[in-house]
């Protein structure tokens, strides 16, 4: 690991640290090159062949036209990019990172797609599925790029497909306008999973010619078919205008956690202007599980304007935990909790609809259903027909929710009910400031007033202490606690997908002196707004206040992070490397 690769960031030169090799990929590169800054590779497929644990691949900005595929033998599918090289642990990953300040876009418009329909014949020509990016590895960190325009013939094709993998960290990735799910994880019984989706977006995905139905399978995020391993988490993610569901964990037999995430307008297509005939349109579809192991956790999430239900359990055999969520103006129900029972073969339904009781019951606490108060809560029952009166039974619908209090909230309980997502159609919402607009520089969710509680709101201090931070004498109802900043979606640590760095990595004591002269970082005069700070792997560490940038930046970094090492400080379009001793 002692190799040195010269690279530039902003206006300064530095050397890679001794803990891993550094490679570059660029749209104008060549796979015959060395993969250096000046002679980058052209494809991630080439990078995948040379990397090992601890290595970093910087992906330069621009459009990558994916027009060739490789065959993934294990799943009998084709891929534009196939990542199979693995890291060794959460602290020794392989990193595929967007070059700071640049935006790589993987465009699959010209990607040849598989023509198989219901079955694969085991050949590339007869494969059923194609994805621009297929991950079949362990301990990777992917960050900062877009995947778009995946085509299809008979089967929906995911923007990013993760198969039999472990601890994949996906950060600030936008997967959109694909003919299938934005993201799809399929981990089976391999002891895998444990992925972290941090600040990712999935929107405007639609599968019009799916053999199962028009719009049937294009979810924003899908996690399916896992039976053991580690828990996958979503933090700070958004799903909107996907033809099927926003988040779908159908047949996921292992827990999933979703927090501080949004689902809007799912079940609509073409920027919200129409509905496909076969899309479901749920915001958070957290089921089904057939073996009683898939108890999921959904907290501090918001679902609005979805065609069907905001928060939906989808005929599961085990309840989930729904804490401090807000459901607003969803078409069918705010919270729909239908449940059932399967035989031991986990295939045959013994009963269509049953209440889940005792340790199998759903846990619903501190949730807001607005404006549809009780009539559309849809707790744990459904009437199959006029003859099925035994199924027409109410079951417990949680505690300390708006419907438990018979709390009929109004517009006066909220700071604002206005957002572009409530009024704008036919346009790309990701470009318009609002709940679904541009993210903060660190990738976290935009801080807007939509659905926040107003001073004096009847939902303030009405909740139960469930272990989440709160400001008043008791927790509030809904996703946003009055008197506290919006929940950060910048993860400081995650047991399921490894630790985000809390300080810059130290240079190895065995590394040689750099052969390039590094200029002393200059103070930034007249600066407005904070600067973002990253480690040498491109991982976000925090911010430096504007006033500290006018003086000794190294001293400010030492005071802020208190660890010697090399930092990247980015303000606007300028990135400086700063060494703290």
Name each region found by the language model.
Residues 60, 93, 97-103, 138-149, ...:
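Right-handed parallel beta-helix
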Residues 67, 76-79, 260, 294-447:
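Predominantly extracellular beta-rich ligand-binding scaffolds that present long acidic/polar faces
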Residues 536-575:
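Short, surface-exposed loop/turn motifs with a glycine/proline- and acidic-biased composition
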Residues 424, 432-487, 491:
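Surface beta-loop-beta hairpin patches that serve as ligand-binding interfaces in beta-rich domains
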Residues 68-69, 108-111, 116-118, 130-131, ...:
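Short glycine/acidic-rich loop motifs that flank beta-strands on beta-rich extracellular proteins
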Residues 45, 49-53, 66-95, 105-143, ...:
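Extracellular beta-strand-rich solenoid/capping regions of secreted or surface-exposed proteins
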Residues 27-66, 80-84, 457, 476-479, ...:
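Acidic Gly/Asp/Thr-rich repetitive segments characteristic of extracellular carbohydrate-active
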Residues 488, 494, 517, 533, ...:
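Terminal processing/anchoring signals of secreted or surface-associated proteins
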């Amino acid at each position: 690991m002692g190799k040195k690769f010269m690279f530039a960031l902003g206006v300064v030169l530095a050397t890679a640290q001794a803990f891993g090799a550094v490679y570059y990929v660029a749209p104008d590169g060549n796979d015959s090159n060395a993969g250096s800054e000046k002679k980058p590779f052209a494809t991630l497929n080439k990078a995948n062949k040379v990397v090992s644990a601890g290595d970093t691949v910087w992906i330069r900005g621009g459009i990558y036209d994916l027009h060739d595929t490789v065959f993934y033998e294990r799943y009998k599918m084709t891929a534009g990019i196939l990542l199979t090289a693995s890291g060794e642990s959460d602290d020794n990953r392989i990193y595929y990172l967007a070059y700071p300040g640049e935006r790589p876009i993987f465009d699959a418009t010209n990607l040849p797609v598989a023509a198989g329909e219901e079955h694969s014949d085991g050949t590339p020509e007869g494969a059923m599925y194609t994805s621009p990016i297929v991950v079949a590895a362990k301990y990777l960190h992917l960050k900062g790029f877009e995947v778009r325009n995946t085509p299809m013939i008979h089967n929906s094709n995911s923007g990013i497909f993760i198969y039999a993998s472990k601890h994949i960290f996906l950060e600030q990735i936008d997967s959109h306008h694909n003919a299938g799910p934005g993201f799809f994880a399929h981990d089976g019984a391999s002891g895998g999973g444990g992925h972290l989706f941090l600040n990712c977006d999935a929107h405007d995905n639609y599968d019009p010619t799916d053999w199962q139905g028009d719009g049937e399978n294009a979810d924003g995020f899908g996690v399916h078919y896992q039976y053991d391993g580690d828990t996958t988490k979503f933090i700070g993610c958004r799903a909107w205008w996907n033809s099927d569901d926003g988040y779908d964990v159908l047949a996921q037999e292992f827990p999933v956690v979703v927090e501080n995430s949004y689902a809007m307008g799912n079940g609509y297509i073409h920027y919200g202007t129409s509905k496909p005939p076969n899309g479901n349109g749920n915001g958070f579809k957290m089921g089904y599980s057939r073996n009683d192991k898939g108890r999921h956790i959904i907290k501090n999430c918001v679902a609005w304007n979805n065609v069907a239900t905001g928060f939906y359990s989808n005929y599961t055999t085990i309840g989930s935990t729904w804490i401090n969520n807000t459901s607003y103006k969803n078409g069918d129900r705010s919270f729909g909790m239908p449940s059932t029972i399967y035989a031991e073969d986990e295939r045959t339904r013994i009963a269509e609809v049953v209440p889940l009781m005792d340790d199998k019951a759903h846990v619903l606490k501190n949730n807001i259903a607005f404006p549809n108060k009780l009539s559309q809560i849809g707790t744990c029952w459904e009437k199959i027909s006029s003859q099925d009166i035994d199924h027409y039974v109410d079951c417990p619908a949680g505690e300390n929710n708006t419907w438990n209090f018979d709390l009929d909230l109004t517009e006066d309980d909220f700071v604002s009910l206005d957002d572009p997502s409530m009024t704008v159609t036919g346009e790309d919402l990701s470009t318009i400031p609002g709940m679904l607009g541009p993210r903060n520089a660190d990738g976290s969710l935009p801080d807007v007033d939509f659905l926040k509680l107003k001073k004096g709101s009847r939902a303030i201090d009405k909740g139960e202490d469930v272990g989440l931070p709160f400001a008043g004498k008791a927790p509030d109802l809904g996703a946003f606690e009055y008197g506290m900043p919006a929940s950060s979606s910048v993860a400081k640590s995650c047991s399921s997908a490894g630790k985000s760095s809390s300080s810059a990595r130290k240079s190895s004591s065995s590394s040689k002196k750099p052969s390039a002269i590094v200029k002393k970082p200059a103070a930034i005069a007249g600066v407005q707004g904070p600067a973002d700070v990253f480690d040498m792997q491109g991982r976000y560490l925090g911010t430096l206040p504007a006033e500290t940038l006018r003086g000794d930046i190294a001293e400010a970094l030492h005071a802020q992070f208190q660890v010697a090492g090399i930092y990247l400080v980015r303000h606007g379009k300028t990135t400086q490397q700063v060494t703290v001793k």
